[in-house]
C-alpha cells in the first residue's frame, strides 16, 4: 500500500482553472481535506483576475478553456508570478506535453490521471 500524504504542513492555496464541472468535482474530491485552500475559476480571464489579487502555491491549469488555451497562458503566469508552480492537465495527446513544459509548466498530466499521480506531483512541487 502506497502512502500518498502531501508535503503541505500549513494551508497552501491551489487555484484550479477548469471549465468542465465533472473534472472540477473530481479535483476537489481528490484535494479536499488535504490542507489546501482550493479556489476555482472557469476561464483564463478569471484566472488572470484571480492571480492579480491572490498568490496560490500551485495552479492546476486545463488546456482547452472557453477563452483560449492554457498552454498559451503558462508563459504569462511564469513571467508575472515566477514562484507559482503549474500543473498542466490535458485530454489532448502527449504532443502538448513538450509545448507545455517548454512554456514553463512544472508538471504535465494527461487525462485521465490517477489520484496518486496528482498527489505525487503536488507533493514534489511543494517540497
Which residues does each PLM region occupy?
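Alpha4 helix (beta4-alpha4-beta5 surface) of REC/receiver domains from two-component response regulators
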Residues: 72, 92-109
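Conserved acidic carboxylate
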Residues: 18
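Non-catalytic signal-transmission and effector/linker regions of two-component phosphorelay proteins
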Residues: 1-15, 57, 116-127
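Acidic catalytic/metal-coordinating carboxylates
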Residues: 43, 69-72
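Two-component/phosphorelay signaling modules centered on CheY-like receiver
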Residues: 21-39
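Acidic, metal-coordinating helix/loop segments flanking the phosphotransfer/catalytic sites
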Residues: 40-58
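Active-site residues of response regulator receiver
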Residues: 62
Amino acid at each position: 500500500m502506497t502512502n500518498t500524504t502531501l508535503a503541505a504542513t500549513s494551508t497552501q492555496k491551489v487555484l484550479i482553472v477548469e471549465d468542465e464541472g465533472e473534472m472540477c468535482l473530481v479535483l476537489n474530491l481528490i484535494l479536499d481535506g488535504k490542507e489546501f485552500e482550493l479556489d476555482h475559476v472557469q476561464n483564463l480571464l478569471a484566472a488572470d483576475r484571480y492571480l492579480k489579487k491572490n498568490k496560490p502555491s500551485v495552479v492546476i491549469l486545463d488546456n482547452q478553456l472557453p477563452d483560449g488555451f492554457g498552454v498559451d497562458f503558462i508563459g504569462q503566469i511564469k513571467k508575472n508570478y515566477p514562484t507559482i508552480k503549474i500543473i498542466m492537465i490535458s485530454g489532448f495527446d502527449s504532443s502538448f506535453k513538450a509545448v507545455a513544459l517548454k512554456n514553463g509548466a512544472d508538471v504535465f498530466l494527461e487525462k485521465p490521471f490517477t489520484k496518486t499521480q496528482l498527489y505525487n506531483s503536488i507533493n514534489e512541487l511543494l517540497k
